[in-house]
Amino acid sequence: MTRIKICGITTLEDALAAVEAGAHALGFNFSTTSPRAVTPQTARSIISAIPPFITTTGIFVEQSPDEINSICERCNLHCAQLHSEAYDAQSSLAVSAPSIIRVFRAGPSFHMDQVRSYAGKTGIRNFLFDAFREGQPGGTGESIEDTTAIRIFKETASIGSAILAGGLKPENVGRAIRLVSPYAVDTASGVESVPGRKDHDKIRAFVRAVQEADNDSSSPEA
């Protein structure tokens, strides 16, 4: 079963819509430069009102490990998602969140050596792969090129859990799952009406598309 994370949650209404649709995880963006940014106070208020067994993830770009630890504790986050090359092995090990996801932005020249090296130095085995755009940590709405994605996800299978992000929406997520069989898929802009606000119909359509792709993969003819 492919897990589903709806990222860039800013309101309780959107959080509950995602949960009711079947999302397994919600992402809260604490980067001050993001149009989907939330304050720790807002995130904590939303998280306290969602049902149990939903994984809550904090997205961090420019925060120090101490700041990340403080926000994770205050908001009761299950997971810290670390964007940017600033989070090397040393700084990642200083993050005390229950679980850590390290983000890698994958262009055509992306080398898996950096993933292997990071995993070896930290013991972290959860990776999110997003499309590369110069100067942006993620959330570009662009997809990883097919050949690159196939190579990355094939090689990551022996290292850890690989999450696919980058331009995913109801119209293409099924194809992406069939292409690379990710552990999970992650979307933000693909289910929005405007940046920071979700379109609930798109969320439901996204979840249905994931479930349909999973059903196709598990059928005897697959």
Curated annotation (Swiss-Prot):
Quickly give the catalysed reaction: N-(5-phospho-beta-D-ribosyl)anthranilate = 1-(2-carboxyphenylamino)-1-deoxy-D-ribulose 5-phosphate
Enumerate the Gene Ontology biological process terms: L-tryptophan biosynthetic process
Assigned keywords, A-Z: Amino-acid biosynthesis, Aromatic amino acid biosynthesis, Isomerase, Tryptophan biosynthesis
Q: In which pathway does it act?
A: Amino-acid biosynthesis; L-tryptophan biosynthesis; L-tryptophan from chorismate: step 3/5
Q: Which InterPro entries match?
A: Aldolase_TIM (IPR013785), PRAI_dom (IPR001240), RibuloseP-bd_barrel (IPR011060), TrpF_fam (IPR044643)
The EC class name is isomerase
Which EC numbers does the record give?
5.3.1.24
What GO annotations for molecular function exist for this entry? Answer: phosphoribosylanthranilate isomerase activity
What family is it from?
Belongs to the TrpF family.
What is the designated name of this protein? N-(5'-phosphoribosyl)anthranilate isomerase
Q: Organism source for this protein?
A: Prosthecochloris aestuarii (strain DSM 271 / SK 413)
Starting at the broadest rank, the lineage of the source organism is:
Bacteria, Pseudomonadati, Chlorobiota, Chlorobiia, Chlorobiales
Originating gene: trpF
